[in-house]
From Swiss-Prot:
Belongs to the somatotropin/prolactin family. The gene is gh. It holds the Pfam family Hormone_1. It comes from the Eukaryota. Transmembrane segments: none annotated. The lineage of its organism: Eukaryota, Metazoa, Chordata, Craniata, Vertebrata. Disulfide bonds join C69-C177, C194-C202. Keywords: Disulfide bond, Hormone, Metal-binding, Pyrrolidone carboxylic acid, Secreted, Signal, Zinc. GO terms for molecular function: growth hormone activity; growth hormone receptor binding; metal ion binding. It comes from Perca flavescens. One of its GO terms (cellular component) is extracellular space. The modification Pyrrolidone carboxylic acid is found at Q18. This is Somatotropin. PANTHER family: SOMATOTROPIN (PTHR11417:SF2), SOMATOTROPIN,PROLACTIN (PTHR11417). Residues 1-17 form the signal peptide. Gene3D superfamilies: 1.20.1250.10.
Amino acid sequence: MERAVLLLSLLSLGVSSQPITDGQRLFSIAVSRVQHLHLLAQRIFSEFESSLQTEEQRQLNKIFLQDFCNSDYIISPIDKHETQRSSVLKLLSISYRLVESWEFPSRSLSGGSVSRNQISPKLSELKTGILLLIKASEDGAELFPDSSALQLAPYGNYYQSLSTDESLRRTYELLACFKKDMHKVETYLTVAKCRLSPEANCTL
């Protein structure tokens, strides 16, 4: 009798732990992909900055700090404390929207040793992976009631004919914003993944 109870307990444990294992695997893939995108973003931005004069870098950085990224319209945690208090579904939802906002602008992201062909497909793969994680959640279907209303402009006048100075500024802004957003997504997915391990310390 005791042996039967033990066997049932082990079977029950195996069934209940399987979704967590699958979830951890999906999260690991998503985190790995966004880490790679973040590294690409850092590399492109660094290569672009190195092509500028010191004064140009200083002026562009000053302007960027006073400006906004297109994705700033996507409501997200304002600091690490709010990030840690946010639910997994909320972090996944924000990550999805951030990645989605770069699908069109990413076609213009390239520089030095990185081609645009390295970025757009990886963004699409990451978006698909995050969507799978959302759909795997019970409340996933309720996360996007207003998704059709979220239409972000493709970085304003970036695709218009600009003067040399304006073109330089827009390129700097685009690359800096991409790096910033990939860092956000990496942070959110890392925290969300950590939540799957009850004993883990998910502090930032």
